[in-house]
Amino acid sequence: MKRLQKRLHGHIVVCGFGLSGSVAVRELLESGVDPNSIIVIDQQQSALESATALGVAGLLGDPSREDILQQAAIRVAKAVIVTVSDDQTAILVTLSIRSIAPETKIVVRIQEHVFQRQLRQAGADVIVSSTKIGGLLLADAVESRYIVPFVNDLLSARGRVTLLERPAAPREVGRATNTVTGMLIVGLVHDGRMFSFYEDAPRTIEEGDVLIVMESTRATRTEEA
């Protein structure tokens, strides 16, 4: 573990390797994240065996315990994904993480939306309500045939279309959002405020803006190559 800690910096910690945790790890790997930069914490040895079979590191223990989090070098982690079995445990884990790592990004999966406020107070940066998202997609599927497959494609690293969040490039600064070619800008964040293409007029991109863009994965892979 000491050898592992020495190379951990800017890594991703996944607390809980159940269904959601395993999907998250696989998706990170599919998107190109180095397996050596992922560590999974779980209390079940069988879960860790499944995780390490994917090439990531495993740490046996309770993710709400500060000593376990310290072993995962949580203070210098890039982000922590919390996908534990119940929402109240998620709150406890989030509190423990935030007490050690005030700057680390914390992403939490919850099952009941009513716990969102408590998780915000505990220090969660991003909260994903799996039941709410699932319910919305189920409702959409009643009246449509193609929306759910499109959303699945959009969210998957293996999909044909990808949704990216990135800083505005120098060549884009000064241009209107509807004149940038090669991608679809669906959102722009300026000074912390989100502007969406479907509810706001085209905006001029400024230095420091964050763009949310939709583009083909083929184009993305070509740029990376």
Spans of features found by a protein language model:
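Cytosolic regulatory regions of ion transport systems
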Residues: M1-A225
